[in-house]
């Protein structure tokens, strides 16, 4: 009597789609208010001047200007939007 389990019972074979996280606007790029700068899980990068943070930790521009990444205290990374002279006029 053959004792063999029926085939086709693999418990693998699932995967979820990538979440499209990462930097969307890089340093030196121009942004307008509302532009998403970074999509992230947790605060890998903190909001600086003229940058807001959504409930899912997305960083977005609050004003028109140029994106700038910089280091802060405690080794934290920050992203700010520097207002440009022509944008202020």
UniProtKB/Swiss-Prot annotation:
**Which Pfam families does the protein's record reference?**
Ribosomal_L27
Gene Ontology MF: a single term: structural constituent of ribosome
Keywords, in A-Z order? Ribonucleoprotein, Ribosomal protein
Coiled-coil intervals, chain numbering: none
- From which domain of life does this come? Bacteria
* Gene Ontology cellular component terms for the protein in this record: cytosolic large ribosomal subunit
Give the span(s) annotated as Disordered.
1-21
GO terms (BP aspect): translation
Alphabetized HAMAP family for the sequence: Ribosomal_bL27
Per the record, the similarity remark reads:
Belongs to the bacterial ribosomal protein bL27 family.
Q: Under which name does UniProt file this protein?
A: Large ribosomal subunit protein bL27
- What's the encoding gene here? rpmA
């Amino acid at each position: 009597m053959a004792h063999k389990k029926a085939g086709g019972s693999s418990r693998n074979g699932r995967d979820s789609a990538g979440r499209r996280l990462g930097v969307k606007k890089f340093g030196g790029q121009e942004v307008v208010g509302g532009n998403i700068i970074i999509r992230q899980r947790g605060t890998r990068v903190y909001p600086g001047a003229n940058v807001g943070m959504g409930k899912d930790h997305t960083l977005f521009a609050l004003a028109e200007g140029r994106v700038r990444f910089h280091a802060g205290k405690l080794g934290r990374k920050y992203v700010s939007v520097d207002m440009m002279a022509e944008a202020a006029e």
